[in-house]
Amino acid sequence: GLVGSEMCIRDSDHIMSLDLVRESFGYPPVYVAESEASWLYTPELNLSGLDRHNDIETLVLKPAEHFFIYYEKYDLDGFTFYVLPTPGHSIGGVSLVFPEGHFVLSGDALFRESIGRTDLPTGNFDQLITGIKQELLHLPKEYDVYPGHGPATTIAHEKMFNPFLK
């Protein structure tokens, strides 16, 4: 069964089924960045309350059980990862690094040859670029990057081809 759920991103498109997943898998603990804890149950912050989302149900989810600690190593039933701060798309953006699998879940921070939006509440372009350069681009170049949207990439590919990181 599911032993935990880690939220890189609090946007409604990433969390809309969270309570259903919790219920279906016996309420595993949920981890979020402390700075975004209230976003799970605040529609204006998780973006489900925006006028442009008329087709999405307003989300008021149960609170998370735990907060991430940056650079802390987590082991959930054999899945070992650590948390890197990659704010900028949102104030509490994080990326999850799985060293044994040689990959990172970058949420909405880093995409193939692009980066996340910074025009939403608490977005900050400079903070996003700094976080990506200081945290993600120091990972081994062969690491795969799995973003919150779109195709996978690698650290090497982004160093070479991402126009935002030049």
Question: Model-predicted segments: where are they?
Answer:
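Single conserved hydrophobic/aromatic residue that forms the stacking wall/gate
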Residues: G1-G4, C8-I9
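Short, active-site-adjacent cap segments at secondary-structure transitions
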Residues: D13, S38-W39, A152-I155
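Metal-dependent catalytic neighborhoods of phosphoester/phosphodiester hydrolases
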Residues: M16-G26, H157-E158
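A short helix->loop->beta-strand "cap" motif at the edges of active sites that frequently abuts
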Residues: F25-P28, K141-Y143
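Acidic/polar short surface loop at catalytic or gating sites that assists cofactor/ion binding
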Residues: P28-A64
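Metallo-beta-lactamase
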Residues: L45-G49, T80-K166
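Short acidic-hydrophobic, aromatic-tinged amphipathic segments that line or gate anion-handling sites
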Residues: E65-Y70
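Short acidic-hydrophobic surface loop/beta-edge motif
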Residues: E72-D77
